[in-house]
């Protein structure tokens, strides 16, 4: 955090530690956050121990907007980042995190921005038009040892799958060149055409192809659930992605 002084009153603390005001804390929040992280860790352990090639961790609340010192965007702690660090400490020399949620994974980026052992790639709505607004631009490429290991693909409103998948193919090529030991996918179904708070135009059948392309990398893959707000469709879109990941 750039400011050295933490306010004493509660509204000030919320403004200091929260990147946005929509992420409320209530009875049961801490238990849910802890359980969500444990789901990601269980998935990471299953991958790291070689028990499975693909694991889906249905994490709620999500995590990719949370950094070391800020929460927000419905995220409190970063499940994907915790899983990546666990993999690093349990046999993986390099880990790649591919974030395909509609919103930029600003928290994941911040956590690994100065590291070369975790490659972070994010496909998302252009932050000029979408949350989190202040991060997710193409010129954010990492810092220090992490220079070149952060890759952002901001995309315009109304982007259809045939344009979106061009960015995915570029990201997949970068992952293949990086040659990680394991892959984490931060999956959000809010890229769907009828998602109420997003502006991409992916259709339900597109998620089959998305999963299949990622599967072609042949990497042990942990999928961690992030966003998705078209309530009637989030289930089928997630299932379609997971089916594609097994193809």
Enumerate the predicted regions with their spans.
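HDAC/HDAC-like amidohydrolase catalytic core signature
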Residues: 1-247
């Amino acid at each position: 955090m750039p400011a050295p002084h933490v306010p004493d009153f509660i509204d000030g603390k919320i403004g200091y530690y929260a990147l946005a005001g929509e992420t409320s804390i209530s009875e049961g929040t801490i238990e849910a956050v802890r359980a969500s992280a444990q789901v990601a860790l269980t998935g990471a352990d299953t991958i790291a121990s070689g028990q499975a090639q693909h694991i889906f961790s249905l994490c709620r609340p999500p995590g990719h907007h949370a950094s070391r010192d800020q929460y927000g965007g419905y995220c409190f702690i970063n499940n994907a980042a915790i899983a990546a660090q666990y993999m690093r400490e349990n046999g993986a020399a390099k880990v790649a995190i591919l974030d395909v949620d509609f919103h930029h994974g600003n928290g994941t980026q911040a956590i690994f921005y100065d590291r070369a052992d975790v490659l972070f790639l994010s496909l998302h709505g252009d932050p000029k038009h979408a949350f989190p607004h202040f991060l997710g631009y193409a010129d954010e490429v990492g810092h220090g040892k992490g220079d070149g290991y952060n890759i952002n693909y901001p995309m315009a409103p109304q982007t259809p799958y045939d344009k979106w998948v061009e960015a995915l193919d570029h990201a997949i090529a970068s992952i293949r060149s990086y040659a990680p030991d394991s892959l984490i996918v931060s999956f959000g179904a809010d890229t769907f055409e009828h998602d109420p708070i997003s502006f991409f135009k992916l259709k339900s059948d597109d998620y089959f192809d998305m999963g299949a392309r990622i599967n072609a990398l042949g990497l042990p893959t942990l999928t961690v659930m992030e966003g998705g707000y078209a309530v009637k469709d989030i289930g089928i879109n997630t299932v379609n992605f997971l089916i594609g990941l097994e193809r």
